[in-house]
Amino acid sequence: MIVLGIESSCDETGLAIYDYSKKKLIADELYSQVKLHKKYGGVVPELASRKHIAKLNLLAKKIFKETGLSFEDIDCIAYTAMPGLVGALMVGATFAKTLGLIHNIDTIAVHHLEGHLLSPLLDHNSNIEYPFVALLVSGGHTQLFEVKEFGEYSLLGESIDDAAGEAFDKTTKLLGMGYPGGVEVANLADQATDKSKYILPRPMKNKPNLDFSFSGLKTAVLNTWYDEQDQSLENKANLCYAFQDAAIDVLVSKCAKALQKTKNTRLVISGGVSANKLLRHQLDLLAKNRGYQIFFPPMKYCTDNGAMIALAGAYRYVNGFKDSNLEINVKARSPL
């Protein structure tokens, strides 16, 4: 069973083809709009939608040409329907529905977060058994789930204000750095010369619940930098280190609590921030010290991509889900 996946929820235009029977990704194409939006310091929704319109058909032609497949080989077309930028979602959904109608192929709406949650399965060495705890950590979401079976997601905790990735992005703006924030902060943190110069708060780390808060950490960065007399690149690197260390410390601590609370031994990490080297290192240490299994997506599939949508669509399709009509129903916000 072969699925074409379409991702257009924000500023990445992604198409991929996944073979469920072989558990194999056949092809994957991605167009990133980072350079387009960088000069604005963030994603401009109208520009994102227009670029999706310009690129989707081109990527589709390329992916079929390179694989030698045709639409006759496709059993289902999966597309991101929620959450995301409504205009961008509409472009992808309309493209998918149109292809389905023309070629008489079933279509299926996919939740963007479900795509991220399943993305570690794109690693051929990942054989994840249920149940497990999942941390979805990105620019838009920071959430902990207990996953008992496919489609059974119990929310354990989430950010009550900024998402972790959003805090990274806002920190780069406060420090006059570039976009996107996660990469900029991590790279500069690696250049820190005095890792103990700044001590920042760990919001909600010691709270018994599994919720997060990163707004206060962001404010602490702002106040610390405002009061700093020597705003040199060296001190900027030291502050980036302190910020990253605090944010990662909170994420790892909450993951440990979630595993203890649910009595699970398997942990899945996904979303854009899952590419962070320090986060991966600290969670690997946690797993090693306590005998847990931990699963990450391949690095190239941490951020938004069509491969995870094709994968999630395949799992939904074999579980009996598919669109019943041509109605397009996309949502800016939607819980998993």
UniProtKB/Swiss-Prot annotation:
Q: Which residues cross the membrane?
A: none
Which cofactors are reported in the record for this sequence? Fe(2+)
Paired cysteines (S-S)? none
Q: Which GO terms describe its cellular component?
A: cytoplasm
Positions binding Fe cation in this chain are H112, H116, D304
User: How many cofactors are bound and how?
Assistant: Binds 1 Fe(2+) ion per subunit.
The answer to whether UniProt assigns keyword Chloroplast to this entry is no
Localization, per the record, is: Cytoplasm
Reaction(s) catalysed by this chain's protein: L-threonylcarbamoyladenylate + adenosine(37) in tRNA = N(6)-L-threonylcarbamoyladenosine(37) in tRNA + AMP + H(+)
A Pfam match: TsaD
UniProt keyword Iron, yes or no: yes
Q: Which parts of the sequence bind substrate?
A: L136, V137, S138, G139, G140, D169, G182, N276
Kindly list the biological process annotations in GO that this record carries: tRNA threonylcarbamoyladenosine modification
Q: Which UniProt keywords apply?
A: Acyltransferase, Cytoplasm, Iron, Metal-binding, Transferase, tRNA processing
Instruction: Give the molecular function GO annotations.
Output: iron ion binding; N(6)-L-threonylcarbamoyladenine synthase activity
So what EC number does this one have? 2.3.1.234
CDD domains to which the protein is assigned, alphabetical:
ASKHA_NBD_TsaD_bac
Q: Which family does it belong to?
A: Belongs to the KAE1 / TsaD family.
Describe the function of this protein. Answer: Required for the formation of a threonylcarbamoyl group on adenosine at position 37 (t(6)A37) in tRNAs that read codons beginning with adenine. Is involved in the transfer of the threonylcarbamoyl moiety of threonylcarbamoyl-AMP (TC-AMP) to the N6 group of A37, together with TsaE and TsaB. TsaD likely plays a direct catalytic role in this reaction.
Classification via PANTHER family? TRNA N6-ADENOSINE THREONYLCARBAMOYLTRANSFERASE (PTHR11735), TRNA N6-ADENOSINE THREONYLCARBAMOYLTRANSFERASE, MITOCHONDRIAL (PTHR11735:SF6)
**Name of protein:** tRNA N6-adenosine threonylcarbamoyltransferase
